[in-house]
């Protein structure tokens, strides 16, 4: 994972690079980890309904000249916490649109 201001380059298991935009990051004191919500910048990332799939990973930030590292979500408890954060984010976005 390479960091830009609001973009990261994600490398998949096949070695393909994909430019993604960071939606937001947060830290969890309960799990002692940082998390990032991101989505692919390319138009091909949209599904048949025109929706863009958002991904989430734990991450270890890199130093100034080093790449960071994306990590998988490991437990059901982490997924529950992430879902709660996502639902709060979506509710706040909807309130802002009204």
From Swiss-Prot:
Pfam families documented for this protein: DUF1292
Bilayer-crossing regions: none
Domain of life according to the entry: Bacteria
PANTHER family reported for this sequence: UPF0473 PROTEIN CBO2561/CLC_2432, UPF0473 PROTEIN CBO2561_CLC_2432
Family to which this protein belongs: Belongs to the UPF0473 family.
The protein, known as: UPF0473 protein GTNG_2486
Species per Swiss-Prot/TrEMBL record: Geobacillus thermodenitrificans (strain NG80-2)
């Amino acid at each position: 994972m390479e960091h830009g201001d609001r973009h990261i380059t994600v490398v998949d298991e096949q070695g393909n690079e994909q430019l993604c935009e960071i939606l937001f990051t947060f830290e969890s004191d309960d799990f002692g980890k940082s998390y990032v919500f991101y989505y692919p910048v390319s138009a091909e990332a949209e599904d048949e309904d025109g929706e863009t799939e958002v991904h989430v990973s734990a991450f270890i930030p890199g130093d100034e000249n080093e790449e960071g590292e994306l990590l998988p979500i490991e437990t059901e408890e982490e997924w529950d916490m992430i879902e709660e954060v996502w639902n709060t984010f979506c509710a706040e976005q909807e309130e802002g649109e009204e």
